[in-house]
Amino acid sequence: MKVSEFTFDSSTAHNKIFTRLYEPDGEPKAVLQISHGMAEHSALYKPFCEYMAQRGFVVVINDHLGHGRSVTSGALYGHFGEEGGLYNVVEDQRNLQSIMREKYPELPYFLMGHSMGSFIAREFAAAYGNSLTAVVFMGTSAGISTAMWKAERTYLNMLKKAKGARAKIPSLEKIATGPYNKKFKPNRTNYDWVTSKEEEVDRFVNDPLCGFPLTVQGYIDLGTLLYAINTDQWYRRVPKDLPILLISGENDPVGDMGKGVRRVFDKLNKTGHDVKLTLYPRIRHALITEMNSAQVYEDLYAFFSSHLPKAEEPVPEKETEAEPEVSTETEKSVENPAAEEEKETEAAAAEKNDDMPEENAEFPVI
């Protein structure tokens, strides 16, 4: 396989977006674009990218605005921009797709988003779903109520006025993700909720490009997108014939321990979408680093492969009985732990401010 790096211009016109590209040996089957989660970066996906490239997929993944090596001098980790927020990131995904389409114009095109990356992928699917062969929303969320979001937005705007849009306020991180860890007491770290594999948690904790808080504006942008992708309008905007896989752990607090992901699945189902659900018992948030990561890899590969063109399959000599229809909901058990896979770590330090808000009111988790 060939591994390369490049940058492209962000939709903000002020940033360069760092990107990793994995190209298989031989004739490629399809392109898979990956959208990573909050406070992480593209290098964490190296083992999965290599796995897919070894099976004939071109895989491309960038560092989002405010993340990884897309953060340059004068920029802030956890800041998506002064205007446009995460919708800028959605347009960056579209720009990257255009670049890959120029290179591979005829190949099937898949998109997979994890956590915050699934929020980005969900908006992409609503805006540009007709450009995709299929999409995976991994570790996604059913969002919060309108009343809760209004209260949260009011509080964040108060902080923005008092401290500034680019301020880093430690208490916001505790409010946003702190409750996730309460479900796994006693806690060894602040990130026990991410995965049940302690060595993977330690890698996340010790990676200077992971675990940083967003700016005040960053949390406003995140909440705005999360609310939008769980409205009735979003369900109407997503093409009904776009194949969708929802995949999550039943112990993932971002997905409300499976209940929130089921709500998204049920509503997609009721609105006539082509959707399947896979929930893994006893599994937490970061599926590709979990105890059952080998099974997750296989399931993702099987989903993408099932949507490749069938023209090259041999024609049976005689008509065979049709296979039973696959259920739109599938649950996987975790019996075979995955072999530990080494991830690439980039060395850099995230900017952190010590400003604390005068208010410390609790609001719903983003």
Where does each model-flagged region fall?
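N-terminal cap/lid segment of alpha/beta-hydrolase-fold proteins
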Residues: 1-24
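Active-site glycine-rich loops that stabilize anionic/oxyanionic intermediates
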Residues: 36-40, 250
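Conserved alpha/beta-hydrolase
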Residues: 49-74
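Alpha/beta-hydrolase active-site loop
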Residues: 81-101
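Alpha/beta-hydrolase fold nucleophile elbow
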Residues: 104-115
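Alpha/beta-hydrolase-fold enzymes
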Residues: 123-209
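Short beta-strand/loop motif that positions the catalytic acidic residue
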Residues: 246-248
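Catalytic active-site module of serine/aspartate enzymes centered on a nucleophile-bearing elbow/loop
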Residues: 274-317
